[in-house]
A protein has these predicted regions:
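Active-site-adjacent elements of ketosynthase-type condensing enzymes
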Residues: 161-169
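Long, acidic (Asp/Glu-rich), low-complexity accessory segments flanking structured domains
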Residues: 248-266
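A short core secondary-structure module
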Residues: 180-229
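Flexible, small-/acidic-enriched active-site or ligand-binding loops
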Residues: 222-252
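Glycine-rich phosphate/pyrophosphate-binding beta-alpha loops
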Residues: 162, 189-195, 235, 273-277, ...
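A structural signal for short hydrophobic beta-strand segments in well-ordered beta-sheet cores
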Residues: 171-175
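A short, Trp-centered hydrophobic/proline-enriched beta-strand micro-motif
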Residues: 149-158
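Alpha-helical interface subdomain recognition
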Residues: 1-110, 120, 133-138, 145, ...
Length: 429
């Protein structure tokens, strides 16, 4: 297996990129990684700072990313929700979750959660419910356009008064007297890509209180009563994060995703994939912080010697490395289980460990962003210049620690899953 990739120093890249053997990757992964890396270095990295400052991306970038055989790869394995041949989307025929890991990891090298989310996150979290649970009509009408970069999509779960507490969403969808429409009223908040999305995968209340009364609807931006406004957030500036209002929006009943009042199950199914994506991204961002700090520590001189010659700086770098590499191995193990477990089994078995991995990766990201900023000093407090990536990523940290389930909720979920398994074992004894 050939693995040609430039390496300036250890841990700059995952071990399998260079000299270490791995049981997870094939020649297909190596070739795909090279392809994705070339695209990122040509089309993304030279423009990252500009797009982040503008808080938007050129919409033609979606089409470019599809033409490169990359965009459909973020919706999960098998390729395009198992519809690759039918939808005729571009990409490896042997696509698996390690190919998707490569996409998210390589795009993370740009050092901007906003740019990565602005291009990939809406597709990554908003389209899988349509592909996995939607009708054939929705898959073709919406799914194909999004996969080909002709339209954009976002996931609308969070509300002003319901974030991690999904079971208590207030946005309602009531059947019209004629029975042909759902009439949707409510608000959604912190919606990634909402500013420019053409489609919205929306959690609505179609039944009674609690998780049993939730459904998913596909709402289109052109439907009267849909209003979006950009939110001015701490980080991920180019992500198009928005506040969305649905005011008496008439949605055809054919836009129901899956079965009525089954939406909570679909949302939970989607969360594993979303949280795993956060793990991949956050760990690469931690690696970017380490890479930037390592290089700077070799250039910067204080008290007559390079920063890296001070033991306290080397200790910081060592702490960063050990946490990044350990998290990467945990991430690869989960990815392997995603590739080999039946979907029904993995949905339950991986929920707890993926939640804990999200906590691990976001804490490592936060640690590395802080330590890199300490090594850069004042240079990390300025937008642009030598500390550009570190300054930007420090602002992005909270966007990974909170969405998709806060650290506290994720830790509790991990332990509760373990308790369920314990109770199941005890009941058989």
């Amino acid at each position: 297996m050939t693995r040609p990739v430039r390496l300036d120093f250890p841990i700059q890249q995952p071990g399998w990129y260079t000299k270490f053997n791995s049981p997870y990757y094939t020649q297909s992964h190596v070739e795909y990684r090279a392809k994705v890396r070339a695209f990122v270095e040509k089309e993304i990295m030279p423009h990252t700072h500009e797009w982040d400052e503008k808080k938007s991306l050129p919409l033609e970038l979606y089409r470019k990313t599809y033409e490169a055989g990359i965009l459909p790869g973020v919706v999960g394995s098998p390729w395009a929700g198992g519809m690759g041949a039918q939808l005729d989307v571009k990409g490896p025929k042997d696509f698996d979750y390690f190919h998707e890991l490569i996409i998210l990891d390589e795009f993370g090298r740009c050092g901007s959660g906003g740019v990565l989310w602005g291009l990939l996150e809406g597709v990554h979290i908003g389209l899988p419910p349509v592909l996995n649970f939607g009708s054939e009509d929705l898959r073709r009408r919406c799914g194909l356009r999004v996969l080909r970069g002709e339209a954009t999509i976002c996931l609308c779960i969070t509300e002003p008064y319901a974030g991690s507490d999904v079971a208590n969403i207030r946005c309602t969808a009531k059947k019209s007297p004629c029975g042909q429409f759902y009439v949707v009223d409510g608000e959604k908040k912190w919606i990634t890509n909402g500013v420019w999305a053409d489609y919205f995968t929306v959690a609505v209340r179609t039944g009674g209180a609690g998780m049993g009364g939730i459904s998913l609807l596909l709402i289109e931006k052109t439907m009267p009563g849909v209003q979006c406004r950009r939110m001015d957030c701490m980080g991920v500036w180019a992500s198009g994060t928005s506040f969305i209002t649905f005011d008496n929006v008439k949605v055809p009943v054919g836009n129901l995703i899956g079965a009525e009042n089954n939406g909570f199950k679909y949302i939970m199914h989607n969360f594993n994939h979303e949280r795993w994506g956060f793990v991949v991204q956050a760990n690469r961002f931690a690696r970017v912080c380490y890479e930037e700090a390592f290089k700077y520590a070799h250039r910067r001189r204080t008290f007559g010697k390079r920063l890296v010659e001070h033991p306290v700086i080397r200790a910081k770098l060592a702490d960063m490395v050990r946490q990044i590499d350990a998290t990467h191995h945990q991430m690869e193990n989960i990815t392997y289980q995603m590739c080999t477990m039946p979907k029904e089994q993995s949905a339950k078995a991986l929920a707890g460990i993926t939640a804990l991995a999200k906590v691990q990766s976001t804490k490592v990201f936060e640690y590395c962003a802080r330590e890199a900023a300490q090594i850069f000093g004042g240079a990390s407090y300025v937008r642009g210049g030598q500390g550009e990536k570190v300054e930007r990523l420090y602002r992005d940290v909270r966007a990974y620690a909170i969405p998709g389930g806060s650290e506290e909720i994720m830790m509790d979920l991990g332990v509760r899953q373990a308790m369920k398994e314990w109770d199941a074992v005890q009941s058989r004894m």
